[in-house]
Each structure stands twice: as structure tokens, then as C-alpha cells.
Amino acid sequence: METIVKESKGKQEPKECCPLFHPEKWDKKTFNWDHKKFIKASVPTLFHMPFPPLLGKKITKMMKMAEDSNNLDSDKEEILLLFADPSPFKSELYLSVTAKVPNAENTDLSGTFISKVFDGAYKAIPKFINQMDDYLKQQNKKANNYYVHYAYCPKCAKKEGHNYMVLFAEVGK
């Protein structure tokens, strides 16, 4: 886990970045979510590629809203930030929370989700979706929707030497 030192009124305080990711916890698992709570936001994309400054600001704002209302899971390994692209020009972000967050777009997800962990570049997502489709076929399942959770921010992915992502396939309501 990376520790970033942050200056605060002349003192140095450690600030945790991304928690260490354990692929075995998420790989080839089935999750049954019954109104799992999230806050939702969206960012513009250009053919599924988000604009980094806008994305960073949006994620920071979502995290701050959840933290300020004490509705972010205290176990950072349990926090999910899911991405779904309803079009090539828009990405929706879903941050898991423990309760409703004031002044945020609160939503929930329900259904059966099958997850699989991949390690590779962002541009490999279409290939990973094809691999996930093959995996689901072996189980006589078909994805209705896909959500992607990136285990590390770009800085931590570089430090850890892995760009893990969890593909969540919604297979039933």
C-alpha cells in the first residue's frame, strides 16, 4: 500500500492511496446484490476514453462527499468504484457507500453479478469482455451489462507493476 505524505498546517500526515489488491478475493466469484448502495456520477468520454483531469476531479468529489458523510466503508478493500459506458461518449461512475449520501445522486444495484479479474492495459478491455463472455458461456450465462472496477489508480498501478481490473457481468435481476 502506497503512503503519500501530505502537508497540513506545517505537519506531515500520511495519506493512504490505493489498498493492496488481492485478485483471489474477486476472481470468478458470484455476488448477489440486493439494493447495494452507490452514489453515481458521469463524465464525458471520447470513444470510451475519459479525460483524465475531469475524471480525477469527479472521483475526488465523490470520495469527499462519501467521506464527509461517513458513508464510505472503513475497510478500503471493500470500496468499489465501478465504471459503465452507456455510450462511447459517456462513462457512468458508481462509488459504493454504506448509506445515502446527502447532495449526491444516490442509487443502488440489484441482481446477480459474476466477476473475473484481468491484468492489462485499459485498451485491452474489449478483449477482456470477449474472454468474460466465453467464461460466462461455460456456465450457460450471458451478460446483460458490464461494470469495471480498477483496483489501482494509474500511479499505484505503475508502482505495483499490475493494472488489475475486475469485470462484473450482470447476469440476472
Residue ranges and their predicted role:
Residues 1-173:
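A solvent-exposed interaction/effector surface
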